[in-house]
Amino acid sequence: MTPETLPIDQYEQQLAEKAARLRQMMLAFQAPEAQIFRSQPAHYRMRAEFRIWHDEDDLYHIMFDPQTKARIRIDHFMPGSPLINALMAEMMTAIRPEPLLRAKLFQIDYLTTQSGEAVVTLIYHRPLDDAWRECAAGLRDALRARGYHIQFIGRANKTKIYLDRDYVDERLTVAGRTLIYQQIENSFTQPNAGINVHMLEWALAATEGAQGDLLELYCGNGNFSLALARHFDRVLATEIAKLSVEAAHYNIAANHIDNVQIVRMSAEEFTQAMRKEREFTRLKEIDLQSYRCETIFVDPPRSGLDEATVSMVQAYPQILYISCNPDSLCRNLSTLSTTHTIERLALFDQFPYTHHMECGVLLVRKATAV
């Protein structure tokens, strides 16, 4: 497999191998059979980063082989969205003959949406000035005239220049409703939009008929918060990354949702607040005791939940856990399964043709643990 080719004829086989591996990992927890959610076999990634190689008069995207570190020229990126591939060709054609855009260009990042928007970030090993801005604006206008809904950003050491804005608005149809998600350049977004919709709809199905309020840790830009808000009286969500919190507030307003509250703090800090170990100014205007959270939703980083957070999570009757690392998920389940039973299990093929697996579990408190 190379970035320009994918073994599409082996897609089902690689997915079956992941499903078998997950099944084996979940045997100890008596989990039900996993629901399997397939990715598109090609053109599934909505974002991509490439180094830029200067070869005399030529200029092209490259990646490095993860094993040999050999340089690989990339003219077509089969995992990337059709818009990424179209823009890759447009950018190289435009930049090669233009010294102001080409000089010491080091990297190009692409962020695209299913709704046809794109942010292209040009990263340089030199200062950027007004001449660069004017030249970049000319390229932006030329591409817009050809129908591209595009934004440009220039980055250099301690410098970020954006001509209009530094984000795109993604529009996803989730269980019959269209949701708007601001996605800010250089902040986390779900890379596989199709699988993201599957995850959102699975989470909605898992919380059908839920009671009371929802507590969410690691909410990002409100990806799950906004979709799940329809099933709960109120949603209280935490996130530590400043850009993601700003995007979450934007998304709440854009979708006219009035029952979601975002707090900028880490899961560990929120655990301390819930245990009344520390007081936080950020929670001053929020009456935690007024929330009737019967369900908690967690989508932690690869490291999973720390021990204190696992202990806090166990207090909730229903736990919805999205994991990008089955190993840390299993480590957490070794504790959570003492008080809760896995009612649902899902495998989301977020990264086809790799060993990575995205999983979802719904845990419900055992009657004996009440």
UniProtKB/Swiss-Prot annotation:
EC category: transferase
One GO biological process term: tRNA methylation
Assigned keywords, A-Z: Methyltransferase, S-adenosyl-L-methionine, Transferase, tRNA processing
Lineage per the UniProt record: Bacteria, Pseudomonadati, Pseudomonadota, Gammaproteobacteria, Enterobacterales
Binding sites annotated in the UniProt record for S-adenosyl-L-methionine: Q190, Y218, N223, E239, D299
Organism the protein comes from: Sodalis glossinidius (strain morsitans)
One GO cellular component term: cytosol
Location of the active site: C324 (nucleophile), E358 (proton acceptor)
Annotated InterPro entries: MeTrfase_TrmA_AS, MeTrfase_TrmA_CS, SAM-dependent_MTases_sf, TrmA_MeTrfase, U5_MeTrfase_fam
GO molecular function, one term: tRNA (uracil(54)-C5)-methyltransferase activity, S-adenosyl methionine-dependent
A Pfam family matched in the record: tRNA_U5-meth_tr
Record-given protein name: tRNA/tmRNA (uracil-C(5))-methyltransferase
Keyword Thylakoid set for record: no
Function of the protein: Dual-specificity methyltransferase that catalyzes the formation of 5-methyluridine at position 54 (m5U54) in all tRNAs, and that of position 341 (m5U341) in tmRNA (transfer-mRNA).
Gene giving rise to this polypeptide: trmA
Catalytic activity: uridine(54) in tRNA + S-adenosyl-L-methionine = 5-methyluridine(54) in tRNA + S-adenosyl-L-homocysteine + H(+); uridine(341) in tmRNA + S-adenosyl-L-methionine = 5-methyluridine(341) in tmRNA + S-adenosyl-L-homocysteine + H(+)
Similarity field: Belongs to the class I-like SAM-binding methyltransferase superfamily. RNA M5U methyltransferase family. TrmA subfamily.
Organism superkingdom: Bacteria
Enzyme Commission code(s) on record: 2.1.1.-, 2.1.1.35
